[in-house]
Amino acid sequence: MRVMIVEDQTMIRSLLESYFRAEDGYRITASLPGAKQAVEVCRTNSVDLILMDVQTENRENGLTAVRQIKAIQPKIKIIVVTSLIDCAVLDEAKRAGADSLWYKDSTQKRLMDVVRQTMAGEHIFPDAPPTVEIGMAKSTEFTKTEL
């Protein structure tokens, strides 16, 4: 399976690459820091799966890229990856045409499960963002406006 990773943080991008290299059947065809680059690569290259960060290099919007990629290559499966805890990201990812969403604070096993399920035609979206600590409080203790 041909995989593209779109993530602006070099360390996270390298970690995601290592996850796929550790599994049989995956080949990383592109690993990019920017969403615009991903759209261009999809115009000329065959890709089966994309892991797309919500906000990439130069503040490029990954969800905009999801829309553009789905318009030119609708069969490509796209998993949005994010660390944002905003509930709106879930809805925006669905509206953009993403096939699934995975939170970066989750495990390698969970990511690979989401990949397998997505490639099997399932759509995996968490019911809610993860709970994170913000100072001495938890994110669930704040309103959407306060977050």
List the predicted regions and their residue ranges.
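Conserved acidic carboxylate
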Residues: 7
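Two-component/phosphorelay signaling modules centered on CheY-like receiver
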Residues: 10-30
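Acidic, metal-coordinating helix/loop segments flanking the phosphotransfer/catalytic sites
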Residues: 31-49
